[in-house]
Amino acid sequence: VTDKKLYQQKIERQANNDFLTGLYNRMRFEQDLAHCIEQTKEFGGEGALLYIDLDDFKHINDGLGHQYGDILLKNISDSLRRIPGVENNCYRMGGDEFIIILAHRQIMMLQKILNDIRTLFSKPWMLKGADYYCTMSMGVVRFPTEGDTVEELIKKADIALYAAKCSGKNRVEFYDENVESTSFRRLDMEKNM
């Protein structure tokens, strides 16, 4: 392998991967999701987007320090990546948010993947010699039935995630149109307060 080839690989890794966790980044996510949407339209089938936000991550970051928050993010990333069906389909969106794309090949594993993620977050994480719990909330949207563009799917997954957070956190909510209208009303009320 030549130096030029190694340099090219390094540039691609920097462009596509999150520097902290090694997961793919938001830019790569948008490219991959667009490709998955096209595949499901062309060949049929269904996919799903799982939008994960860590609950009360700020408390760990502020209480233990950012270096331990970073360690937790790395540990969570590594653990998510080890779940069968997730592997290279996990992306760090920034901060404490992650997205998993399940293409039509993985959609049959949706319930098992959700259970594996719940199990992962039901256990403590070892930080600074002690156990700390960090739960997650998740919004799930299916494609192309509930959306067929990157922007629409992110918006709907975020709405489902918001519903999970508002329902007490540490939950998984599937997108539904009734949730969307309720979320928009709640956002309008909060904005006008």
Predicted regions and their residues:
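PAS/PAC or PAS-like capping segment
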Residues: 1-2, 54-55, 178
